[in-house]
UniProtKB/Swiss-Prot annotation:
GO terms for cellular component: extracellular region; extracellular space; plasma membrane. It comes from Drosophila melanogaster. InterPro entries: Peptidase_M2. Disruption phenotype: Defective heart morphogenesis leading to lethality. The lineage of its organism: Eukaryota, Metazoa, Ecdysozoa, Arthropoda, Hexapoda. In contrast to ance, does not hydrolyze angiotensin I. This is Angiotensin-converting enzyme-related protein. Gene3D superfamilies: 1.10.1370.30. Zn(2+) binds at residues 375, 379, 403. Coiled coil: none annotated.
Amino acid sequence: MGACNITVLLLVIMLWLPHGLSMGNSCSASVLEARRFFELENEQLRRRFHEEFLSGYNYNTNVTEANRQAMIEVYARNAELNKRLAQQIKSSDYVQSEDADIRRQAEHLSKLGASALNADDYLALQNAISSMQTNYATATVCSYTNRSDCSLTLEPHIQERLSHSRDPAELAWYWREWHDKSGTPMRQNFAEYVRLTRKASQLNGHRSYADYWVQFYEDPDFERQLDATFKQLLPFYRQLHGYVRFRLRQHYGPDVMPAEGNIPISLLGNMWGQSWNELLDLFTPYPEKPFVDVKAEMEKQGYTVQKLFELGDQFFQSLGMRALPPSFWNLSVLTRPDDRHVVCHASAWDFYQDSDVRIKMCTEVDSHYFYVVHHELGHIQYYLQYEQQPAVYRGAPNPGFHEAVGDVIALSVMSAKHLKAIGLIENGRLDEKSRINQLFKQALSKIVFLPFGYAVDKYRYAVFRNELDESQWNCGFWQMRSEFGGVEPPVFRTEKDFDPPAKYHIDADVEYLRYFAAHIFQFQFHKALCRKAGQYAPNNSRLTLDNCDIFGSKAAGRSLSQFLSKGNSRHWKEVLEEFTGETEMDPAALLEYFEPLYQWLKQENSRLGVPLGWGPTDKIPSDCCGTFST
């Protein structure tokens, strides 16, 4: 799940979020003077962003202490300039301007974020964050079969074993090794990060860093909407969770997987349990209807990493959207280098100059990376579409929008109709059993992710708001993972352990509810684009959301381009309404997409007598803390 220029998001988020330009009709001298002021300041801001992202990219693609220090120096220097700009705006009357665009720019440029800290505190914060990132990027673990070989990295070595091993002891070994190496040593850095972000938030007039993050959604009710949305989706997740637990018990036996309770994360094929589709062979509803092995077909046809990106580029061009510029191909890092450490977590980068956009990821040729490539190219297309906006508006009006754009393209790309069109499968229309299999496969990532995405920031909100004592930081994390998602660590964890930093986004200070929101918005976007493309009609069995492919639709492309080009210049509800006809985050489209599978799960679980739900985990001390139910 790549984020936009994730590594330097802490600095950028304080200035970067709301975007757009609606100049109004006023021509008063004060308005003209303000417009000139913001025109000049946006150019300076653009140059600072270029410098920041360049230093961040250099560090991410060559993780050395020298590059880390160089990046921090750039951040610190520009933080002082950002602080001066914010103070200048606050001392003016721009926030009360008669011109709506001036007010919007003034409001967002006066949000300082971490730059509000004094120079020493700012450097300490950046050191804490970058130290966590460095540890994550360089952590290695010992092999289960050869304990003297301690050179295994998360990608590809550990993930390959989590995906393919069916030995519970081996899976638990790699889970514990990774968390012990990438998480526990970072507790002091995380505590420093919490202390300093709390201080920065108070200097910005917020009670906590959680409230600072929430305000970027420009809706005082948005947190409540997230809670309500999660509750709407929980019945579907409970059916899926119960079915998977039942099938795991069939495979591993009752000693490894009891009939009820939480599922050990190590059995789910992903380090964090945020996606379970690597274990599809254990869960497939109709195994006599085998899935097409897209990876095998890619290998047969000689696919390369370059080919994956070319296909993504062609998809956007087929919509009449922008082609990738030559600099993308020359300057991106698309595979893992052999001669240096890199942060392999996929991310897309906007350098705020001359359409310079890049991707950094350790790509391999398989169906997972086929999806990730399109996701990251969605970020890239967003950058290209709004690059004409002033720097303050070069971003998404809702943090969830940026993450949703790549995913909405991937929904078309991974459809049977599209896979047939590009020659990876022979049949572009699935029979009912194959359709259930396909929806099930998608649910193992799209639906399974929701409790994880929800818990990551519910946990950090509790930490930031001091609702969770520092003596309970680790057990509180696992209590939330259990309570919201019914998963648990494979081994007992105490406060001597510290597992949250074993996830990249926590190390990198990336607000995470954007991914939860994106998983809802992408289906709203998908439905709107499928209508534009003539690929969807309600109650039409031949034009369903789950087999819609907008490839080649100029009408869909125009609609998407108009939506993206506004950047953050206007409130997200306004641009969402123009794009989809809706004004709120609404899971109805997601539930419609998966409705056939939901009905199948309810019937199958009832037939099999599958128990649903779970109780508290027993893998943490029993006196940890109270429940967190929303």
